[in-house]
C-alpha cells in the first residue's frame, strides 16, 4: 500500500505500512488478484515490517511472504519462524547465502540448524525464490542432503535471473533433479504445492474443472551443467525442455510444432 515497492529506500517508511489498508485492498478491491501480503527489503533492526504484514494477512485471511532485507547484525530467523510468522506463512529465498546480511539455514559446519526442521513441521512454508542473487549450492545441496527441502520451487523471474543461473522454470526444476529430487517431486513443488499455499485449488492440477494450464516437457538425457547465482556449477544427467504450453486451454508455446499439422497436409 502507499507508494508500494518503488525501491529500497522507499520501502523503509514504517508510516507507509498500513495493515488495515493492505487488507482492504486484498479483500475488497482486488480479491481475485491478491493472494497474499509481502514484507520485503526492510533494513530495520526489528520485525516491525513483518508484524505489520502479519496483521494485514490476519485481517484479510491470506498468507504472508517474508523477504528479509539486509540487517546488520542479521535478524534471528528462529524468532521469525517460531514467534512472528503463522503456519502457512512463507519465507522466500530459502537457499540464499549472505550470512552477513541475513541468517542462513545451514551453519558454518555444513549442518542445517535444528529449528529449521521445527519451523517446517510447524507449518512455515519455505520458498526457493531463485532470482538473480538468492540461490547458492552451498546452502541448497547440504540442506537437501539432510532432508530440508523447500516446499515450493519458484523462479523469481526477472531480467537478472533469466540471464543468470536461473534461466527458466524448466532449467530450475532440472537443477533440483540434479540435487537428488525426483521428477514427480519437483513437479509437485512447482504446481500443486504453491496452489495450496495461495488458496487457489483450481490451479496447479489437471482435475476436472481446473484451469487448463498445461506444460508438456521432454526429458533429455546427457551431460548437463547447472549454475547458481555465483556461477558455481553442479553437474546433472537429466534436463527438462518445455515442448508445449497451454494457458487456459490455449496453446501459447509449441517448440517443435507438435500441435500443428504438416504444411502439405490435406
What are these regions (language model features)?
Residues 96, 131, 157:
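Active-site metal-binding loops of divalent metal-dependent hydrolases
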Residues 83, 198, 204-207, 237, ...:
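Residue "hotspots" at secondary-structure boundaries inside conserved domains
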Residues 1-14, 38-41:
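Metal-cofactor-binding active-site regions of metalloenzymes
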Residues 3-4, 97-98, 160:
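A short, flexible beta-alpha/helix-coil linker loop
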Residues 16-126, 134-151:
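Histidine/acidic residue-rich metal-binding segments in metalloenzymes
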Residues 9-11, 100-101, 164:
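Acidic/histidine-rich helix-loop elements
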Residues 211-265:
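C-terminal cap of metal-dependent C-N hydrolases
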Residues 138-221:
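His/Asp/Glu-enriched, well-ordered alpha-helical/loop segment
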